[in-house]
């Protein structure tokens, strides 16, 4: 998982979700697209 100050969807399968006040990008098709907003 990469940590970025600004997160972006990298493909059409990426979803931006919020957990415990942090934003995440999750992608089931390509797990290397996972990101967290730091």
UniProtKB/Swiss-Prot annotation:
- GO cellular component terms given for this protein: cytoplasm; ribonucleoprotein complex; ribosome
Q: What are the protein's UniProt keywords?
A: Ribonucleoprotein, Ribosomal protein
Keyword presence, Ribosomal protein: yes
* InterPro entries, per the entry: Ribosomal_bL36, Ribosomal_bL36_sp
**GO terms, molecular function:** structural constituent of ribosome
**An example of a Gene Ontology BP annotation on this entry?**
translation
One Pfam family it belongs to: Ribosomal_L36
Cross-referenced SUPFAM superfamilies: Ribosomal protein L36 (SSF57840)
Q: Which NCBIfam families match?
A: rpmJ_bact
Q: Which family does it belong to?
A: Belongs to the bacterial ribosomal protein bL36 family.
The protein's name is Large ribosomal subunit protein bL36
The organism encoding this protein is Chlorobium phaeobacteroides (strain DSM 266 / SMG 266 / 2430)
The top of its lineage is:
Bacteria, Pseudomonadati, Chlorobiota, Chlorobiia, Chlorobiales
């Amino acid at each position: 998982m990469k940590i970025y100050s600004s997160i972006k969807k990298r493909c059409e399968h990426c979803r931006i979700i919020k957990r415990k006040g942090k934003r995440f990008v999750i992608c089931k098709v390509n797990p290397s697209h996972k990101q967290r907003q730091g």
